[in-house]
Regions:
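Core catalytic alpha/beta fold that binds nucleotide/phospho-ligands
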Residues: 1-281
Length: 281
């Protein structure tokens, strides 16, 4: 993908879908608060997205939400060869009741393009793949968050946390496993309506759910991020950082020139369906 074009230029460039076995992850930092109102291009958002942006009590949360959704629309538009405002979103059937309020999706792409969006405290993650994918990003948890939420975890995860004497290490470990858990539940389409204690997403990749690959992502010192991909480990995983200028009106940005990080994937014996990155458990 030499140049990622936005808007009308994306139409001329045509679709640029990921290859089979390829996982593309885009990390987005929110636009600077002092320039967001003037430069962030909200015209590409739906009316519902603009209302949601305006509904946040804290301006930083509204800018994070808007930055994430502008990035999502521009990225999907570039991959599909569409203007950002023309990307057709739908909801898949809920796994529990079959009503149309499940995982967000793009309507009828051929070949399929799956995506997942997550955002938290100034950072967003957009994951795109030809197979089902879920993504999550969270700010590093506070000690009280770990204490309150640990009883809801899988017994194996609770045991791993209990074995850690250092409070800082316990927070870091909880943060990594929780982002894996949310990424996996988003990929399932259930979110936290599924009991978070039902599935093991701890440090041992061989105990994680069969048929899925879980990857920790490099996300800086203040966040944890992870993706869950249906099936075996992707052949190629690439993480790119989107500069804030890419969210502004009238921009064409060569994102291959932005920070690009290849994510190493551990591949086990034939049939192994869990992968882990070199950034640890």
């Amino acid at each position: 993908m030499p140049v990622l074009e936005f808007g009308a230029a994306a139409l001329a460039a045509g679709p640029r879908l990921p290859a089979a076995g390829q996982l593309d992850v885009w990390m987005v930092r929110r636009a600077p608060l002092e320039t967001a109102a003037e430069l962030l291009d909200l015209t590409e958002l739906s009316e519902a997205e603009r209302r949601r942006t305006a509904s946040f009590v804290r301006p930083t949360d509204g800018v994070t939400y808007a930055s994430a959704h502008v990035a999502l629309r521009r990225l999907l538009g570039a991959y599909l060869g569409l203007a950002p405002q023309d990307v057709p979103f739908v909801r898949e059937p809920c796994p529990g009741c079959a009503e149309p309020h499940g995982r967000p999706a793009v309507a009828h792409p051929d070949p399929p393009l799956h995506f997942s969006l997550a955002h938290s405290h100034g950072m967003a993650v957009v994951a795109l793949s030809r197979t089902v994918v879920g993504a999550d990003v969270e700010r590093l948890p506070r000690a009280e968050t770990v204490e309150v939420c640990t009883p809801a975890l899988h017994p194996g995860e609770q045991a791993e946390l209990a074995a850690l004497d250092d409070a800082g290490e316990r927070r870091a470990t909880f943060g990594r496993l929780w982002t894996r858990k949310e990424a996996y539940l988003k990929a399932l389409g259930t979110g936290l309506s599924r009991d978070p204690g039902h599935d093991y997403l701890g440090a041992d990749p061989h105990r994680r759910p069969a048929g899925w690959t879980l990857l920790d992502l490099p996300s800086g010192p203040r966040h944890n991020a992870a993706v869950a991909v249906r099936g075996g480990a992707p052949e190629q995983v690439t993480v790119r950082w989107v500069p804030p200028v890419a969210l502004y009106a009238g921009q064409t940005v060569d994102l291959d020139a932005a920070g690009t990080v290849g994510v190493p994937v551990h591949r086990g014996a034939e049939g192994t369906t869990n992968g882990v990155s070199d950034w640890g458990a």
